[in-house]
């Protein structure tokens, strides 16, 4: 059955380049976690913790200290996006010049694929945080993995985040975290959604930090000068995660079909005026050492 097509004449124009897709969230969170770009469906991911201790100098080799290898299985899920649209409906509204020939020219193909890829990125921005594997079209996101029973991650509490409590709540999360994590060479970061970040800025402005009112995109996103604040549009409201980026792993399978999208004019195949387009790809998430992760949220 063809996908239902919604056309908006507000975006009409003679050139395919004037086709305007809806504004989509960028998958900005992918830049704040550890990417595993070529996971062949299932892979053992490891994190090494090396506790170094000094010993008195001797002529012998005597191993000291503790090396801890933590293993978890990162399993990818296969996903697909498939769409079909009638060229007649599409061209009538946007490209009069191509109606007569029925062509799907390069500009139109770029517009279709651009929207498809943007849609995949937008959907994954949310799924990578709150996705649930039992739900069709999703995999377990970081929030789901962290809050799962027996995960080992440490809860600092839950409740609504407002400009009146956001700073105190962040301190609660940080103070709950293990000292070894806060003092590690790889500093943990604070992950929060857009609403929490806006509450944080409001709190700073109320405290007299006017830079948060006028600083724009360049405003400082670091808490007390030590911990980066990563604003992740896909995170659910009233959640904060305090973790090292290496503890949050997002896997894909780029050498297989990840980022491979297609557009297919069906006219020469079945005589129809349909255009099919879509993508097939693999995604999955996993956490490494859950005990090193502190979070706020139910």
Placement of each model-derived feature along the sequence:
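Sequence/fold signature of self-assembling virion shell proteins
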Residues: 2-52, 140-165, 201-298
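Helix N-cap / beta->alpha transition motif
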Residues: 8, 86-93, 191-196, 243-245, ...
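Long, hydrophobic/aromatic-enriched structural stretches that serve as scaffold segments
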Residues: 54-111
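Extracellular structured ligand-interaction cores
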Residues: 78, 187, 274
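Hydrophobic side chains in beta-strands
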Residues: 81-85, 92, 192, 231, ...
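Alpha-helical scaffold segments that mediate packing/assembly in large oligomeric complexes
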Residues: 94-176, 295-298
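Short coil/turn segments at secondary-structure boundaries
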Residues: 95-96, 128-133, 184-193, 213-217
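Ordered core of a single globular domain
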Residues: 171-207
């Amino acid at each position: 059955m063809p996908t239902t097509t919604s056309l908006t004449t507000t975006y009409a124009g003679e050139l395919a380049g004037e086709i305007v897709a809806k504004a989509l969230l960028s998958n900005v969170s992918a830049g704040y976690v550890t990417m595993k770009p070529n996971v062949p469906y299932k892979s053992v991911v490891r994190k090494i913790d090396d506790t170094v201790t000094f010993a008195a100098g001797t002529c012998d080799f005597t191993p000291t200290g503790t090396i801890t290898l933590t293993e978890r299985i990162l399993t990818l899920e296969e996903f697909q996006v498939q769409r079909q649209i009638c060229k007649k409906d599409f061209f009538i509204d946007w490209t009069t010049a191509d109606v007569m020939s029925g062509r799907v020219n390069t500009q139109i193909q770029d517009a279709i694929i651009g929207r498809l890829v943007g849609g995949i990125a937008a959907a994954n921005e949310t799924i990578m945080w709150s996705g649930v594997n039992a739900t069709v079209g999703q995999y377990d996101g970081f929030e789901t993995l962290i809050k799962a029973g027996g995960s080992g991650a440490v809860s600092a509490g839950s409740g609504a985040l407002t400009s009146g409590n956001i700073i105190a709540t962040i301190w609660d999360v940080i103070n709950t975290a293990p000292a070894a994590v806060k003092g590690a060479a790889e500093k943990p970061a604070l992950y929060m959604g857009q609403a929490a970040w806006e509450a944080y800025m409001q709190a700073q402005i109320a405290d007299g930090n006017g830079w948060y009112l006028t600083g724009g995109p360049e405003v400082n996103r670091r808490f007390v000068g030590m911990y980066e604040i990563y604003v992740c549009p896909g995170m659910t409201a009233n959640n904060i995660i305090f973790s090292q980026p290496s503890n949050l792993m997002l896997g894909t399978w780029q050498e297989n079909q990840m980022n491979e999208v297609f557009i297919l004019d069906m006219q020469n195949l079945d005589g129809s005026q349909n255009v099919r387009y879509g993508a097939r790809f693999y995604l999955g998430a996993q956490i490494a050492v859950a005990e090193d992760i502190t979070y706020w949220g139910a």
